[in-house]
Each structure stands twice: as C-alpha cells, then as structure tokens.
C-alpha cells in the first residue's frame, strides 16, 4: 500500500548496467586511481586541496579506502547481481557485459593493491566481513577465466532481453558501446591480452 516508487527493493537488470558503468567511470577514471598515481608519476601536479596533499605524498587511509569501497561496494557488487539476474532471465549478453566490467574492476584493484579478495568478497550479507585475500597471480587467473566466460556469453545466439532500449529516444542501457556486442567481445579479448602480460 505505502510503496515508495523511488526506492525499489529489486532493480531490473536493464537498469543495473548504467549504474555499473557510471560508478566504474568515477572510480577508475576520475578518482584516486588516476589522480593520485598521475600526480605521483609527475604527469601533472596537485596545486589545491586534496591534490596538493597528494602532490606532497600525503595520502590518508580514507583516500585509499575510497577507491576500494567505490569498486567493491558499487560496480562489483552490482556486477554480481546483474550476472545472477541475467542467468535467471536467459540473457547471456548482459551476463557477458557484467563479467567484462567485473574483470576490469578486478584488474584495476590487483594492479594497485596486489593481493585482493574475490571468492569471498561478496558475502558480507551472509556475515563474512573479513574475506580471504587471494594472491595477485591467482587474481589474474580468475580475471582470465571471467573473461573466457564473458566471451562465451557474448557469443551466445540466444538472448531473451535486448541490450538496446525499446525506444530510441530513451537513454541507452549500455553507455559504453550502446549494446554493440562485437565491441564488448573485442574489449574482452583486449583485457585478456593486457592482463596476460602481468602473469
């Protein structure tokens, strides 16, 4: 009776993907992962506020935690949810895209932090608040396996839910490639090659 339409308890999978992509863009492309590392490599200099402190190598645990939380709690958790929903609805293209996004997040985290949690990382709702860490080498193997699954999903002939919006006037469900599966497959292969160089 008193249901707030602006607070859904279950988000349709089509609407998870734009949220995943937007939060990935912020965490990977516009936050600590890029700003701090580029300041430290002297590609540019921090001259004001937080960037000034980072330019003086004064980084706090909050700065690092922000990146960690922005990847695990947002896009990666949503990727797990999207993969599950896509598999339930026979929509392997959505599952494949979510797996490419998951692999991208994992690759970013392991490149920055080395050993990270994955197998137990999404069990917080089940009470596991201290997931086991896996070695960076194992994470690269996991990334490769996830991307293999993604490629198989993206090559699937059967897909119950289209990646494109029904009305061309609506914003796309896929902000990155607008539902172009071939581009997602190419991205998966490119990521496989990129992370194979780290093994």
Regions found by a protein language model. Name each.
Residues 1-51, 55-58, 70:
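Membrane-proximal, proline-rich intrinsically disordered regions
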């Amino acid at each position: 009776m008193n249901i707030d339409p602006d607070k859904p308890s279950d988000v349709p999978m089509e609407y998870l993907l734009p949220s995943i992509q937007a939060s990935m863009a912020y965490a990977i492309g516009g936050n600590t992962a890029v700003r701090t590392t580029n300041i430290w490599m002297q590609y540019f200099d921090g001259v004001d506020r937080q960037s000034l402190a980072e330019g003086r190598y004064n980084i706090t645990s909050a700065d690092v935690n922000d990146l960690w939380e922005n990847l695990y709690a947002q896009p990666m958790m949503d990727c797990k949810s999207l993969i599950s929903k896509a598999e339930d609805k026979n929509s392997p293209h959505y599952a494949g895209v979510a797996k490419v996004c998951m692999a991208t997040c994992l690759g970013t985290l392991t490149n920055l932090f080395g050993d990270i949690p994955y197998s137990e990382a999404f069990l917080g709702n089940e009470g596991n608040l201290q997931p086991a860490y896996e070695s960076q080498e194992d994470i690269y193997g996991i990334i490769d396996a996830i991307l293999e699954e993604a490629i198989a999903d993206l090559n699937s002939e059967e897909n119950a839910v289209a990646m494109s919006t029904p009305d061309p006037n609506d914003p796309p469900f896929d902000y990155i490639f607008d539902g172009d599966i071939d581009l997602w497959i190419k991205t998966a292969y490119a990521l496989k090659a990129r992370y194979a160089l780290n093994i």
